[in-house]
A protein has these predicted regions:
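TRNA-recognition modules of translation machinery and tRNA-sensing kinases, especially anticodon-binding
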Residues: 27, 135-435
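N-terminal alpha-helical targeting/anchoring segments
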Residues: 1-140, 154, 158
Length: 435
Protein backbone atom coordinates (compact mmCIF):
# COMPACT_ATOMS: atom_id res chain seq x y z
CA UNK A 1 0.00 0.00 0.00
CA UNK A 2 1.33 3.40 -1.00
CA UNK A 3 1.34 6.62 0.99
CA UNK A 4 -1.71 8.68 -0.02
CA UNK A 5 0.51 11.77 -0.05
CA UNK A 6 2.77 10.06 -2.60
CA UNK A 7 -0.24 9.22 -4.79
CA UNK A 8 -1.54 12.78 -4.50
CA UNK A 9 1.80 14.30 -5.48
CA UNK A 10 2.83 11.68 -8.09
CA UNK A 11 -0.29 10.42 -9.88
CA UNK A 12 1.56 9.95 -13.18
CA UNK A 13 4.21 7.74 -11.54
CA UNK A 14 1.50 5.63 -9.90
CA UNK A 15 -0.39 5.26 -13.19
CA UNK A 16 2.76 4.35 -15.11
CA UNK A 17 3.52 1.69 -12.51
CA UNK A 18 0.02 0.26 -12.94
CA UNK A 19 0.61 0.08 -16.71
CA UNK A 20 3.92 -1.71 -16.14
CA UNK A 21 2.00 -4.34 -14.20
CA UNK A 22 -0.57 -4.68 -17.02
CA UNK A 23 -3.44 -3.70 -14.71
CA UNK A 24 -4.97 -0.92 -16.81
CA UNK A 25 -8.38 -1.59 -15.26
CA UNK A 26 -6.99 -0.01 -12.08
CA UNK A 27 -5.98 3.30 -13.70
CA UNK A 28 -9.27 5.09 -12.79
CA UNK A 29 -8.65 4.23 -9.13
CA UNK A 30 -5.83 6.79 -8.94
CA UNK A 31 -8.00 9.80 -9.78
CA UNK A 32 -10.86 8.37 -7.74
CA UNK A 33 -8.80 8.01 -4.57
CA UNK A 34 -7.29 11.49 -5.01
CA UNK A 35 -10.79 12.99 -5.25
CA UNK A 36 -12.05 11.03 -2.24
CA UNK A 37 -8.98 12.05 -0.26
CA UNK A 38 -9.62 15.70 -1.16
CA UNK A 39 -13.18 15.38 0.14
CA UNK A 40 -11.91 13.66 3.26
CA UNK A 41 -9.36 16.37 4.02
CA UNK A 42 -11.96 19.12 3.49
CA UNK A 43 -14.33 17.22 5.76
CA UNK A 44 -11.66 16.91 8.45
CA UNK A 45 -10.88 20.62 8.23
CA UNK A 46 -14.56 21.53 8.64
CA UNK A 47 -14.96 19.10 11.54
CA UNK A 48 -11.90 20.51 13.30
CA UNK A 49 -13.29 24.03 12.93
CA UNK A 50 -16.64 22.90 14.36
CA UNK A 51 -14.93 21.30 17.34
CA UNK A 52 -13.05 24.52 17.98
CA UNK A 53 -16.26 26.56 17.71
CA UNK A 54 -18.14 24.14 19.95
CA UNK A 55 -15.49 24.34 22.64
CA UNK A 56 -15.52 28.13 22.48
CA UNK A 57 -19.32 28.28 22.63
CA UNK A 58 -19.49 25.76 25.48
CA UNK A 59 -17.23 28.00 27.54
CA UNK A 60 -19.43 30.96 26.60
CA UNK A 61 -22.54 29.09 27.82
CA UNK A 62 -20.88 28.45 31.17
CA UNK A 63 -19.92 32.10 31.49
CA UNK A 64 -23.43 33.32 30.55
CA UNK A 65 -25.12 30.88 32.93
CA UNK A 66 -22.93 32.22 35.71
CA UNK A 67 -23.83 35.78 34.80
CA UNK A 68 -27.54 34.85 34.65
CA UNK A 69 -27.54 34.17 38.36
CA UNK A 70 -27.02 37.88 38.92
CA UNK A 71 -28.62 39.16 35.72
CA UNK A 72 -31.62 37.05 34.54
CA UNK A 73 -31.56 38.84 31.19
CA UNK A 74 -28.45 36.79 30.33
CA UNK A 75 -30.44 33.54 30.52
CA UNK A 76 -32.04 33.97 27.09
CA UNK A 77 -28.64 34.66 25.55
CA UNK A 78 -27.24 31.56 27.26
CA UNK A 79 -30.09 29.41 25.92
CA UNK A 80 -29.51 30.74 22.39
CA UNK A 81 -25.82 29.82 22.58
CA UNK A 82 -26.73 26.37 23.98
CA UNK A 83 -28.99 25.86 20.96
CA UNK A 84 -26.08 26.79 18.70
CA UNK A 85 -23.86 24.26 20.50
CA UNK A 86 -26.50 21.55 19.99
CA UNK A 87 -26.85 22.38 16.30
CA UNK A 88 -23.08 22.25 15.80
CA UNK A 89 -22.90 18.94 17.67
CA UNK A 90 -25.42 17.46 15.25
CA UNK A 91 -23.49 18.82 12.28
CA UNK A 92 -20.26 17.45 13.75
CA UNK A 93 -21.81 14.00 14.20
CA UNK A 94 -22.82 14.04 10.53
CA UNK A 95 -19.30 15.07 9.50
CA UNK A 96 -17.74 12.34 11.64
CA UNK A 97 -20.01 9.76 10.03
CA UNK A 98 -19.04 11.05 6.58
CA UNK A 99 -15.36 10.98 7.56
CA UNK A 100 -15.64 7.31 8.54
CA UNK A 101 -17.33 6.52 5.22
CA UNK A 102 -14.67 8.38 3.25
CA UNK A 103 -11.90 6.69 5.26
CA UNK A 104 -13.33 3.29 4.36
CA UNK A 105 -13.63 4.16 0.66
CA UNK A 106 -10.08 5.53 0.51
CA UNK A 107 -8.71 2.50 2.38
CA UNK A 108 -10.52 0.07 0.08
CA UNK A 109 -9.04 1.70 -3.03
CA UNK A 110 -5.58 2.06 -1.50
CA UNK A 111 -5.47 -1.70 -0.94
CA UNK A 112 -5.94 -2.23 -4.69
CA UNK A 113 -3.18 0.10 -5.93
CA UNK A 114 0.06 -1.87 -6.39
CA UNK A 115 3.39 -1.06 -4.80
CA UNK A 116 5.93 0.79 -6.97
CA UNK A 117 8.18 -1.88 -8.45
CA UNK A 118 11.96 -1.70 -8.40
CA UNK A 119 13.50 -0.19 -11.58
CA UNK A 120 15.43 -3.42 -12.17
CA UNK A 121 12.27 -5.54 -12.53
CA UNK A 122 11.81 -6.81 -16.12
CA UNK A 123 8.56 -5.69 -17.75
CA UNK A 124 6.18 -8.41 -18.89
CA UNK A 125 2.54 -9.49 -18.58
CA UNK A 126 2.92 -12.84 -16.78
CA UNK A 127 5.35 -15.55 -15.69
CA UNK A 128 6.17 -16.36 -19.31
CA UNK A 129 8.22 -13.14 -19.31
CA UNK A 130 10.27 -14.03 -16.22
CA UNK A 131 14.01 -13.85 -16.85
CA UNK A 132 16.64 -16.43 -15.98
CA UNK A 133 19.51 -14.74 -14.13
CA UNK A 134 21.95 -17.55 -13.45
CA UNK A 135 22.30 -21.30 -12.86
CA UNK A 136 24.01 -23.16 -10.05
CA UNK A 137 25.13 -26.76 -10.50
CA UNK A 138 25.09 -28.93 -13.59
CA UNK A 139 21.64 -30.07 -14.71
CA UNK A 140 21.63 -33.87 -14.62
CA UNK A 141 20.66 -35.99 -17.62
CA UNK A 142 20.39 -39.55 -16.26
CA UNK A 143 20.94 -42.61 -18.45
CA UNK A 144 17.96 -44.40 -16.88
CA UNK A 145 14.26 -43.48 -16.71
CA UNK A 146 13.16 -41.36 -13.75
CA UNK A 147 9.73 -42.39 -12.44
CA UNK A 148 7.00 -39.91 -11.55
CA UNK A 149 7.69 -38.42 -8.12
CA UNK A 150 4.69 -40.12 -6.50
CA UNK A 151 5.85 -43.48 -7.93
CA UNK A 152 9.27 -42.97 -6.34
CA UNK A 153 7.62 -42.42 -2.97
CA UNK A 154 5.36 -45.43 -3.48
CA UNK A 155 8.41 -47.64 -4.15
CA UNK A 156 9.36 -46.98 -0.51
CA UNK A 157 5.78 -47.48 0.74
CA UNK A 158 6.18 -43.81 1.61
CA UNK A 159 2.91 -42.21 0.50
CA UNK A 160 -0.78 -43.06 0.58
CA UNK A 161 -2.90 -40.59 -1.37
CA UNK A 162 -5.84 -42.97 -1.81
CA UNK A 163 -6.45 -43.16 1.94
CA UNK A 164 -5.99 -39.40 2.25
CA UNK A 165 -8.56 -38.94 -0.51
CA UNK A 166 -11.07 -41.02 1.42
CA UNK A 167 -10.37 -39.09 4.62
CA UNK A 168 -9.92 -35.52 3.34
CA UNK A 169 -10.44 -35.39 -0.43
CA UNK A 170 -7.95 -34.42 -3.14
CA UNK A 171 -4.92 -32.32 -2.26
CA UNK A 172 -3.94 -34.32 0.84
CA UNK A 173 -1.59 -37.25 1.55
CA UNK A 174 -0.21 -39.61 4.16
CA UNK A 175 3.60 -39.79 4.33
CA UNK A 176 5.03 -42.99 5.80
CA UNK A 177 8.28 -44.65 6.81
CA UNK A 178 11.54 -43.46 5.28
CA UNK A 179 9.80 -40.81 3.15
CA UNK A 180 8.20 -39.32 6.27
CA UNK A 181 11.61 -39.41 7.99
CA UNK A 182 13.20 -37.69 4.99
CA UNK A 183 10.44 -35.07 5.03
CA UNK A 184 11.22 -34.24 8.68
CA UNK A 185 14.98 -34.40 8.04
CA UNK A 186 14.99 -31.68 5.38
CA UNK A 187 12.82 -29.45 7.59
CA UNK A 188 15.19 -29.90 10.53
CA UNK A 189 18.22 -29.31 8.32
CA UNK A 190 16.61 -26.15 6.93
CA UNK A 191 15.92 -24.95 10.47
CA UNK A 192 19.51 -25.48 11.60
CA UNK A 193 20.87 -24.01 8.37
CA UNK A 194 19.00 -20.75 9.01
CA UNK A 195 19.99 -20.68 12.68
CA UNK A 196 23.62 -20.96 11.52
CA UNK A 197 23.00 -17.80 9.45
CA UNK A 198 22.02 -15.90 12.60
CA UNK A 199 18.23 -16.23 12.36
CA UNK A 200 16.09 -16.77 15.45
CA UNK A 201 14.00 -19.94 15.34
CA UNK A 202 10.28 -19.31 15.78
CA UNK A 203 7.16 -21.46 16.02
CA UNK A 204 4.36 -18.98 15.29
CA UNK A 205 0.56 -19.11 15.63
CA UNK A 206 -1.02 -21.15 12.85
CA UNK A 207 -4.17 -19.00 12.82
CA UNK A 208 -4.28 -15.20 12.50
CA UNK A 209 -6.86 -12.41 12.60
CA UNK A 210 -8.33 -10.90 9.43
CA UNK A 211 -6.59 -7.54 9.93
CA UNK A 212 -3.22 -9.33 9.88
CA UNK A 213 -4.16 -11.18 6.69
CA UNK A 214 -5.15 -7.87 5.10
CA UNK A 215 -1.82 -6.44 6.23
CA UNK A 216 0.36 -9.06 4.58
CA UNK A 217 -1.36 -9.84 1.27
CA UNK A 218 -3.76 -8.53 -1.35
CA UNK A 219 -7.49 -9.22 -1.25
CA UNK A 220 -7.18 -11.25 -4.46
CA UNK A 221 -4.50 -13.50 -2.96
CA UNK A 222 -6.46 -13.72 0.29
CA UNK A 223 -9.60 -14.95 -1.48
CA UNK A 224 -7.65 -17.45 -3.57
CA UNK A 225 -5.50 -18.86 -0.76
CA UNK A 226 -6.87 -18.52 2.76
CA UNK A 227 -9.18 -20.80 4.70
CA UNK A 228 -11.42 -18.90 7.15
CA UNK A 229 -12.55 -20.43 10.43
CA UNK A 230 -16.35 -20.33 10.39
CA UNK A 231 -17.82 -17.96 12.97
CA UNK A 232 -14.39 -16.67 14.06
CA UNK A 233 -12.13 -13.79 13.08
CA UNK A 234 -9.40 -16.32 12.33
CA UNK A 235 -7.72 -17.67 9.20
CA UNK A 236 -5.44 -20.69 8.79
CA UNK A 237 -2.05 -19.43 7.62
CA UNK A 238 -0.98 -20.08 4.04
CA UNK A 239 2.64 -19.51 5.08
CA UNK A 240 4.32 -18.70 8.39
CA UNK A 241 5.52 -15.43 6.86
CA UNK A 242 2.04 -14.09 7.65
CA UNK A 243 2.19 -14.74 11.38
CA UNK A 244 5.90 -13.89 11.72
CA UNK A 245 5.40 -10.47 10.10
CA UNK A 246 2.21 -10.08 12.13
CA UNK A 247 4.28 -10.38 15.30
CA UNK A 248 5.38 -6.78 14.75
CA UNK A 249 1.94 -5.22 14.17
CA UNK A 250 1.63 -1.76 15.77
CA UNK A 251 5.22 -2.00 17.06
CA UNK A 252 7.91 0.67 17.16
CA UNK A 253 11.11 -1.38 16.98
CA UNK A 254 14.20 0.24 18.52
CA UNK A 255 16.61 1.04 15.67
CA UNK A 256 19.40 -0.83 17.42
CA UNK A 257 17.27 -4.00 17.32
CA UNK A 258 16.99 -3.97 13.53
CA UNK A 259 17.15 -6.13 11.56
CA UNK A 260 14.77 -8.68 13.02
CA UNK A 261 15.52 -12.04 11.39
CA UNK A 262 13.24 -15.00 12.04
CA UNK A 263 12.98 -18.50 10.63
CA UNK A 264 9.97 -20.63 11.39
CA UNK A 265 8.42 -24.03 10.93
CA UNK A 266 4.69 -24.29 10.33
CA UNK A 267 2.03 -26.29 8.58
CA UNK A 268 0.52 -24.29 5.71
CA UNK A 269 -3.05 -24.43 4.41
CA UNK A 270 -4.09 -23.23 0.96
CA UNK A 271 -7.20 -23.40 -1.21
CA UNK A 272 -4.95 -23.33 -4.31
CA UNK A 273 -7.69 -21.84 -6.48
CA UNK A 274 -6.80 -20.45 -9.88
CA UNK A 275 -5.15 -21.57 -13.08
CA UNK A 276 -2.97 -24.27 -11.53
CA UNK A 277 -5.46 -25.98 -9.24
CA UNK A 278 -4.88 -29.18 -7.29
CA UNK A 279 -2.84 -31.99 -8.81
CA UNK A 280 -4.95 -35.11 -8.36
CA UNK A 281 -2.12 -37.62 -8.21
CA UNK A 282 0.98 -35.65 -7.32
CA UNK A 283 2.04 -33.44 -4.43
CA UNK A 284 3.18 -30.32 -6.30
CA UNK A 285 0.07 -28.31 -5.39
CA UNK A 286 -1.81 -29.44 -2.31
CA UNK A 287 -4.05 -28.04 0.41
CA UNK A 288 -1.75 -28.82 3.36
CA UNK A 289 2.03 -28.95 3.64
CA UNK A 290 4.87 -28.03 5.98
CA UNK A 291 7.47 -25.36 5.39
CA UNK A 292 10.52 -23.71 6.90
CA UNK A 293 10.33 -19.98 6.13
CA UNK A 294 12.53 -16.92 6.70
CA UNK A 295 11.60 -13.25 7.15
CA UNK A 296 13.51 -10.02 7.70
CA UNK A 297 12.28 -6.71 9.14
CA UNK A 298 14.91 -4.05 8.50
CA UNK A 299 15.67 -0.40 7.77
CA UNK A 300 14.79 0.71 4.21
CA UNK A 301 18.41 1.25 3.23
CA UNK A 302 19.25 -2.37 4.09
CA UNK A 303 16.48 -4.22 2.25
CA UNK A 304 18.24 -4.58 -1.11
CA UNK A 305 21.27 -6.21 0.53
CA UNK A 306 19.02 -8.53 2.52
CA UNK A 307 17.17 -9.52 -0.64
CA UNK A 308 20.42 -10.77 -2.19
CA UNK A 309 21.37 -12.57 1.02
CA UNK A 310 18.04 -14.38 1.23
CA UNK A 311 17.95 -15.84 -2.27
CA UNK A 312 21.62 -16.83 -1.95
CA UNK A 313 20.73 -18.76 1.22
CA UNK A 314 18.30 -20.82 -0.88
CA UNK A 315 20.92 -21.56 -3.50
CA UNK A 316 23.45 -22.61 -0.85
CA UNK A 317 20.92 -24.85 0.89
CA UNK A 318 19.83 -26.69 -2.25
CA UNK A 319 23.35 -27.09 -3.60
CA UNK A 320 24.38 -28.67 -0.28
CA UNK A 321 21.87 -31.43 -1.10
CA UNK A 322 23.24 -31.84 -4.64
CA UNK A 323 20.21 -30.25 -6.31
CA UNK A 324 20.92 -28.00 -9.34
CA UNK A 325 18.98 -24.73 -9.24
CA UNK A 326 18.55 -21.50 -11.12
CA UNK A 327 17.47 -17.98 -10.17
CA UNK A 328 14.52 -16.60 -12.14
CA UNK A 329 13.71 -12.88 -11.91
CA UNK A 330 9.95 -12.29 -11.74
CA UNK A 331 8.61 -9.79 -14.27
CA UNK A 332 6.27 -6.90 -13.46
CA UNK A 333 3.07 -8.73 -14.36
CA UNK A 334 4.01 -11.74 -12.24
CA UNK A 335 4.66 -9.68 -9.10
CA UNK A 336 1.97 -9.68 -6.43
CA UNK A 337 0.72 -6.15 -5.73
CA UNK A 338 2.63 -5.77 -2.45
CA UNK A 339 5.98 -6.82 -3.91
CA UNK A 340 8.73 -4.44 -5.00
CA UNK A 341 10.98 -7.17 -6.40
CA UNK A 342 10.88 -10.96 -6.38
CA UNK A 343 12.70 -13.97 -7.73
CA UNK A 344 12.03 -17.69 -7.79
CA UNK A 345 14.62 -20.32 -7.08
CA UNK A 346 13.82 -23.25 -9.34
CA UNK A 347 15.16 -26.78 -8.94
CA UNK A 348 16.11 -29.07 -11.79
CA UNK A 349 13.82 -32.00 -12.57
CA UNK A 350 15.79 -34.78 -14.32
CA UNK A 351 12.51 -36.53 -15.21
CA UNK A 352 10.98 -33.52 -16.94
CA UNK A 353 14.32 -32.05 -18.04
CA UNK A 354 13.25 -28.61 -16.84
CA UNK A 355 13.31 -26.40 -13.76
CA UNK A 356 10.37 -25.84 -11.40
CA UNK A 357 9.78 -23.45 -8.50
CA UNK A 358 10.85 -24.49 -5.00
CA UNK A 359 11.48 -21.11 -3.33
CA UNK A 360 10.14 -17.58 -3.72
CA UNK A 361 12.16 -14.63 -2.39
CA UNK A 362 10.47 -11.22 -2.12
CA UNK A 363 11.24 -7.66 -1.08
CA UNK A 364 7.96 -5.96 -0.13
CA UNK A 365 9.46 -2.57 0.66
CA UNK A 366 7.25 -0.74 3.16
CA UNK A 367 3.97 -2.26 1.89
CA UNK A 368 3.35 -4.67 4.78
CA UNK A 369 4.88 -2.28 7.31
CA UNK A 370 2.51 0.51 6.24
CA UNK A 371 -0.53 -1.75 6.49
CA UNK A 372 0.53 -3.19 9.85
CA UNK A 373 2.14 0.00 11.20
CA UNK A 374 5.60 -1.53 11.77
CA UNK A 375 7.95 1.37 12.49
CA UNK A 376 11.24 2.49 14.01
CA UNK A 377 12.79 5.82 14.97
CA UNK A 378 15.74 7.00 12.89
CA UNK A 379 18.83 8.76 14.25
CA UNK A 380 16.94 12.07 14.19
CA UNK A 381 14.09 10.66 16.23
CA UNK A 382 11.74 10.67 13.23
CA UNK A 383 9.31 7.77 12.83
CA UNK A 384 10.00 5.65 9.75
CA UNK A 385 8.40 2.56 8.23
CA UNK A 386 10.44 -0.63 8.19
CA UNK A 387 10.92 -2.81 5.13
CA UNK A 388 9.98 -6.50 5.13
CA UNK A 389 11.31 -9.44 3.13
CA UNK A 390 10.56 -13.15 3.01
CA UNK A 391 11.87 -16.30 1.39
CA UNK A 392 11.14 -19.99 1.43
CA UNK A 393 13.80 -21.99 3.20
CA UNK A 394 12.52 -25.45 2.38
CA UNK A 395 9.00 -26.62 1.56
CA UNK A 396 8.58 -30.37 1.37
CA UNK A 397 6.97 -32.27 -0.21
CA UNK A 398 7.55 -30.12 -3.34
CA UNK A 399 11.23 -29.79 -2.53
CA UNK A 400 11.40 -33.59 -2.19
CA UNK A 401 10.35 -33.94 -5.83
CA UNK A 402 13.68 -32.36 -6.77
CA UNK A 403 15.53 -34.19 -4.00
CA UNK A 404 14.30 -37.66 -4.95
CA UNK A 405 14.76 -37.18 -8.69
CA UNK A 406 18.29 -35.77 -8.35
CA UNK A 407 19.46 -38.36 -5.82
CA UNK A 408 17.75 -41.40 -7.34
CA UNK A 409 20.11 -44.16 -8.48
CA UNK A 410 19.62 -46.59 -11.37
CA UNK A 411 18.82 -49.46 -8.95
CA UNK A 412 15.96 -47.47 -7.37
CA UNK A 413 17.84 -46.49 -4.22
CA UNK A 414 18.09 -42.87 -3.12
CA UNK A 415 21.42 -41.45 -2.01
CA UNK A 416 21.24 -39.28 1.12
CA UNK A 417 23.57 -36.25 0.95
CA UNK A 418 26.10 -36.02 3.77
CA UNK A 419 24.47 -32.92 5.29
CA UNK A 420 21.35 -34.98 6.04
CA UNK A 421 23.04 -38.00 7.61
CA UNK A 422 22.72 -36.66 11.19
CA UNK A 423 19.00 -36.03 10.62
CA UNK A 424 18.42 -39.53 9.21
CA UNK A 425 20.05 -41.42 12.08
CA UNK A 426 23.14 -42.05 9.99
CA UNK A 427 21.21 -43.57 7.07
CA UNK A 428 23.13 -42.90 3.86
CA UNK A 429 20.97 -44.72 1.32
CA UNK A 430 17.24 -45.38 1.15
CA UNK A 431 16.39 -48.81 -0.24
CA UNK A 432 12.98 -49.33 -1.88
CA UNK A 433 10.66 -51.88 -0.31
CA UNK A 434 9.11 -52.84 -3.62
CA UNK A 435 10.11 -52.72 -7.27
Amino acid sequence: MLDIKFIRENPDIVKENIKKKFQDEKLPLVDEVIELDSQRRANIQEADQLRSDRNRLSKQVGMLMGQAKKDPSKLAEAEAVKKQVTDEAERLAALEKLEAELDEKVHHIMLQIPQIIDPSVPIGPDDSANVEVQRFGEAKVPDFPIPYHTDIRESFDGIDMDAAGRVSGSGFYYLLGDIARLHEAVLAYGRDFMISKGFTYCIPPFMIHGNVVEGVMSQTDMDAMMYKIEGEDLYLIGTSEHSMIGRFIDQIIPAEKLPQTLTSYSPCFRKEKGSHGIEERGVYRIHQFEKQEMIVVCKPEDSKAWYDKLWNFSVELFRSMDIPVRQLECCSGDLADLKVKSCDIEAWSPRQQKYFEVCSCSNLGDAQARRLRIRYKDENGKMQLCHTLNNTCVAPPRMLIAFLENNLQADGTVKIPEVLWPYMGGTKVLVPTKK
